[in-house]
C-alpha cells in the first residue's frame, strides 16, 4: 500500500512542527514540506501549481500570520488579508486538485467576547468579537466557513479544529510580545538568575484560563483528521462543523504563576499588581464534542510547563526574541 502524501502548511510554526514531529514517527506517511521561500502561500498560482505537481492526499493547514495585541492593532489589514489569502489559496487549490481530506487549524478567538462559559461550538457568531483581534478572528471564521462550503457544494471532507491557549516547544519567548506562559517562564528564569527578591505579575491573579500543550494539540489534530467520515458527520453539523480542542480544565493566573515559579525553581515572592487590568474573568472551551469523539488530553499543566522550560533552556540561543 502506498504511503499517504501529507502536506503540512506551516510546518515550522509551533503547531505545525508538533504535527510534523508526530507524523514523522510513522511509517505509513510521506510528508511534503515547503518553507516560505520555497512556496509563497499568498500566491494563488504558486499554490495551485504546487498542488498540481505534488499529488497531495491530505493537508494540515497550520500556516497563519499570528501576533499579539499590539501587532493586531497596528497591522489589522495584514492580519485579515494574509490569513484569508493563505486559507483561500490552500483550500481552493486542494479542491481543484482533488485533495479530499484537509484539516484547518483555527483559534478560540472566533468566539464572542462575552460568550457563555465554557464556550461550546454553538457560540460561534452569537455576539460581538473582541475588538483587539477582530480581523484575525474574522479570517479564522472564514476558514471554517470555507471548509464547510466546499463540503456542502463539492462533497469534500474538510474539517476544522479550534484550539484553546497553546504553549510548548517553539513558542515565542520575546519579552514584550509573548503570551502569558512563555512570558512568565522567561521572567521567572531571569529573576532566578539575578536572585531577584520578587516577581511582579500584572493583575489580581484571579482570571481563569485554559492551557493545552502543543503536543496534545498535534495529537488531537491527527485524531480528528483520521476519524471515519461517518463518525465525524454524526458528531458535527454541516453549518457548525468545527471542533473545540482543549483540556476542559482551567486555572487562575495566580495558580499558573505559582506553578511556573515551582518549575523554574524560583524562591522569591510572587507579587500581583492589582492596579493592572485583568482582562476577561474566564475563558474556557467546552470540549464535550471532542470527548465524544474519543480524544482526551494527556499532558498535565505542570508536566507540560516543565518540558517547555527544559526546551527553553536548551534553545536560548535560538528562541524568537
What are these regions (language model features)?
Residues 24-49:
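Adenosine-cofactor binding site in Rossmann-like domains, unifying the SAM/SAH pocket
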Residues 88-133, 159:
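Conserved Rossmann-fold NAD(P)-dependent oxidoreductase catalytic core, especially the SDR/UDP-sugar
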Residues 9, 34, 59-65, 102-108, ...:
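SDR active-site strand-loop-helix element
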Residues 135, 139-142:
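Active-site helix of classical SDR
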